């Protein structure tokens, strides 16, 4: 058969790619009061700014079931599971517990994507393409690790209060984002969200976003991802500017943030991911 790649729903990859490459996706959970929503499975309107809206990782049992099915599909070739940053979610740790429960440390290899959203999706894509090309378990794992280490991610959010409330951003960084400036620019550094810049207007924030992506891409080919939450026009503008400034872009993916990330980023958020060298 072939190595099978597993991820969580934060990866934000289009359904056609998931199907084409045989990627197994485990849903994250959004909790609205006493109601639990499985991202990508259950439909329910969500007020992302509401105080009673939170998120949770898949359980070790859910991940164990997904890994077991993926192992069956691989017919012994093995599984590479790529999950969102362990600094941002308990998903990776739940995956590690699942692997322990399965006694499958040599056949199910875990990768911390050091990101979320397409910053998880790109390492997944690199791994799945390597697997589709006949890569060994070790080669598929290394493809994911390289993509995770090489990607650079930047965000513009309207306010940082939701990130701070959810524990994804320090109180100090949140203060700068909510009190002193109107539009903070954030970046992911080793899987952790940090404040990168402080600007007064949304247009200046997007200019910083594009400049950061251009610097990260360098002169060679690169894959670019643009994500947003209810900000399609802004995402299209950013994408157009990136295409103009980075003619060497190998591929571009545009996606809306799923509910589990939207709860923390808030309406109007726009993110850009750059992976120099592309996704394989």
Question: What function would you assign to each model-found segment?
Answer:
Residues 3-65, 69:
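N-terminal glycine-rich anion-binding loop in soluble enzyme alpha/beta folds
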Residues 4, 10-24, 29-33, 78, ...:
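Mixed-charge interfacial surface used for oligomerization/domain docking
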Residues 53-60, 81-92, 113-117, 130:
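Short gly/ser-rich anion-binding loops that grip negatively charged ligand groups
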Residues 61-99:
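Active-site cofactor/cluster-binding pocket
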């Amino acid at each position: 058969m072939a190595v099978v790649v597993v991820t969580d729903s934060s990866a934000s990859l289009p359904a056609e790619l998931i199907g084409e490459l045989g990627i197994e996706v485990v849903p994250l959970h959004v909790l609205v009061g006493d109601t639990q929503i499985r991202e990508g499975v259950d439909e329910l309107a969500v007020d992302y700014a509401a105080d009673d809206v939170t998120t949770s990782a898949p359980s070790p049992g859910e991940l164990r079931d997904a890994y077991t099915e993926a192992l069956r599909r691989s017919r012994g070739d093995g599984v590479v599971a790529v999950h969102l940053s362990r600094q941002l979610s308990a998903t990776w740790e739940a995956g590690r517990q699942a692997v322990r429960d399965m006694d499958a440390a040599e056949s199910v290899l875990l990768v911390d994507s050091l990101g979320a959203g397409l910053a998880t999706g790109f390492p997944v894509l690199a791994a799945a393409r390597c697997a589709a090309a006949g890569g060994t378990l070790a080669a598929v794992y290394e493809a994911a690790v390289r993509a995770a280490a090489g990607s650079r991610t930047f965000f513009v959010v309207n306010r940082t209060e939701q990130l701070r409330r959810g524990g994804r951003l320090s109180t100090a960084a949140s203060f700068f984002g909510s009190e002193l400036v109107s539009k903070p620019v954030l970046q992911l550094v080793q899987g952790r969200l940090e404040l990168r810049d402080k600007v007064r207007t949304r247009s200046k924030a997007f200019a910083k976003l594009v400049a950061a992506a251009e610097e990260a891409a360098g002169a060679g080919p690169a894959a670019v991802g643009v994500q947003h939450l209810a900000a399609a026009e802004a995402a299209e503008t950013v994408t157009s500017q990136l295409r103009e400034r980075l003619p060497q872009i190998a591929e571009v993916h545009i996606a809306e943030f799923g509910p589990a990330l939207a709860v923390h980023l808030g309406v109007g958020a726009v993110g850009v991911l750059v992976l120099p060298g592309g996704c394989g």
